[in-house]
Structures are given as structure tokens and as C-alpha cells.
């Protein structure tokens, strides 16, 4: 997947992170490094290929913008 493809399929992009609603979870992709991904489910990061700091950051961005994902 290219950065453009990830951005196009995203429901919301916040600070370079693409948030895509899937069935029962939110997929997060760092558009600057497509290998960095996370899964948010029930308000928690449940899977991640990001650092702990990035996990905290994408979760904060999610909580501030989740109304746009509903």
C-alpha cells in the first residue's frame, strides 16, 4: 500500500496518522512510515507496531477526534 492509498481509504487523518474504521476496530497507519500501524478497539490500543509514545499519541488523537469516525 502506498501513502496515497492509505490516505485515500482513511476516514480521518490527524497529524499524519490515517484512521480507518474497520469491522469492530480502528486501524491506524503512520503516513510517514507505513510499517508503523496500530489497532484501536474499545478505546484501547490492542495491537501495535509503534513505540509506546506513538501508541499514546495516536490514542489521544483518536479520543479527540472519534466523533468524526462515527
Regions found by a protein language model. Give the residues of each.
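Negatively charged, low-complexity tracts enriched in Asp/Glu with abundant Ser/Thr
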Residues: 1-15
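A short, structured beta-strand/loop element
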Residues: 14-53
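Mixed-charge, Lys/Arg-enriched low-complexity segments
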Residues: 44-70
Amino acid at each position: 500500500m502506498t501513502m496515497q492509498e492509505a490516505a485515500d481509504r482513511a476516514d480521518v487523518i490527524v497529524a499524519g496518522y490515517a484512521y480507518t474504521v474497520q469491522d469492530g476496530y480502528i486501524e491506524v497507519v503512520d503516513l510517514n512510515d507505513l510499517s508503523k500501524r496500530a489497532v484501536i478497539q474499545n478505546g484501547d490500543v490492542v495491537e501495535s507496531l509503534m513505540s509506546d509514545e506513538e501508541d499514546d499519541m495516536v490514542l489521544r488523537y483518536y479520543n479527540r477526534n472519534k466523533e468524526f469516525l462515527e
